[in-house]
């Protein structure tokens, strides 16, 4: 053991003696008891992580991950960002940082205790009356994470079924913990070593719920410093559920005698520790209320669903807020709260703030995200129910208006938080349901519309500017100030004062000491380059003349540095503009070429369409001419053969000759009609005049055929007669 540890142990022993002198029971140490951890692990299934009944269960109601505003701080290969001594807003509001989601604090920061399973060293031992117990193997500091309470995360119906089942199976111990409304952790069969933590009416630990990624997880934390060998206990009456009340063996002076069950007695905690702290409730306030209830003879009933005493909660007067610590406690509970009664009590306390520094603290601790969630909670169709079971929708409306008024009072900041929380969208939906709130909503939205949005400083920005500026990770700014990024350079910005500075504002704390032993106020350790006017290691008094000369030299150096920075920024902007113009020119050429190709394609397509149309019209014209010719042929063929047969001279021809004559006559008549008018169709009915003309044409045609036939016959006879009258040719002897 080191010297410091010896001193610490001595101080702890003094504290125990003092407590004993004041009437408190001295802390018992069990470090001599055998370590039965291995034996205890055989009594249940040890889980690496909780088992969820479905994907939806155990999920934190706010789906958007909330980043902290810390910056990574590596030393000896370890990222010390977001540690116990930091102002990490995630740590303060019970949210763990997640690798690759927190953009500025870097990976593997110190706010990942659940994810990395950074448990305190503990051991299991056998107690006299309580079965197994958990003891500290080393001293545990106040608020240190001890262990995660793991098990099967189930819904309320399954929880009630298991209560009955375990009771019927005569289980001696119960291991249910409420995770959130309607959801429970059951560590009876599957869990972690934390299930063996026993109850005490004067506990040294407490249970708290943390948001890890998108899930709520439950951890056990030290309420005060716990000595090595001391048993680790918490108050079951607040945090744990069981079917039947059981005898308590904690042996504390204030022991109430029983734990579990539905009825609370004299020393029972009426509220979970974190809610009591957020409301400013002290142990003396609880005892006073319990005493009054006992004197009146009334039973003290806790809420079956949430294990809190609604009657006590409703009786509380609003406690004033005195410090940023109070704001932190309230905001950490509000972010996880979906109980309207608890939320309304916390909001009433928050509404009493009349100091801008405290309002800034509320904004800093994911304020806009929290108020967005609260508005949604009170907008829901389900009205608030008071301690007597009465629905009070008017109270819901009152709190919605109260939140709007509080938001209106908040000092001006950047618009980043409003946009990331989407609270403006929630406010825009209110007038549709509550028209009388439209003026309040419009006024608030008008105020927010004037806020400016800035890029946040990122890890990359810090690395680039590291040699030219103060290490931003170690600068603590006054309320209302934040670090933004503008034109590639970090600035200190106060939206309320409309002020931007290149260096930390007055009122900010000095640069925090780094983890090395460098001098914090020296220019080199703070990240500011040494100037000719920097302090020498050996200080000596300067004459007025020498002081003025050094001052002028320093001012000249700063002026030159400022001019150089301006020139560099101007050159950078010119280069960016040149590159932008070149890219624009190339883009315009590409667009022009694309348009040209598009026009050519359009022309080709147009020509193709015109050619197709011309071809179609030609086909249509030919087709129409052929159709008319066919119709005229059909028209004449309907009566020409009959007229030929009736002609007296037709008897001189056989059937085939008459058929051929009919075809020829029809073709001749059709040709004549089309020559007269190529677009005229044949009439539907044959007129007498037309019939007469066709008949005359047929008679004329037949006469010509007969005449030709006779002439041909006569010519043939004449030729034959000539051959017969000619003397035969002479033959030679």
UniProtKB/Swiss-Prot annotation:
Domain Post-SET: 244-260
Keyword Repressor: yes
Main subcellular location of this protein, as a coarse class: nucleus
Disulfide bond positions: none
GO cellular component: chromatin; cytosol; nucleus
Region (Disordered): 1-32, 504-548, 672-692
Listed InterPro entries: AWS_dom (IPR006560), Post-SET_dom (IPR003616), Set2_fungi (IPR025788), SET2_Histone-Lys_MeTrsfase (IPR050777), SET_dom (IPR001214), SET_dom_sf (IPR046341), SETD2/Set2_SET (IPR044437), SRI (IPR013257)
Sorted UniProt keywords: Chromosome, Coiled coil, Methyltransferase, Nucleus, Phosphoprotein, Repressor, S-adenosyl-L-methionine, Transcription, Transcription regulation, Transferase
Modified residues (Phosphoserine): 10, 522
Any further remark recorded for this protein: Present with 217 molecules/cell in log phase SD medium.
Oligomeric form and interacting partners: Interacts with the RNA polymerase II hyperphosphorylated CTD. Interacts with CYC8.
Biological role: Histone methyltransferase that trimethylates histone H3 'Lys-36' forming H3K36me3. Involved in transcription elongation as well as in transcription repression. The methyltransferase activity requires the recruitment to the RNA polymerase II, which is CTK1 dependent.
Protein name: Histone-lysine N-methyltransferase, H3 lysine-36 specific
UniProt gene name: SET2
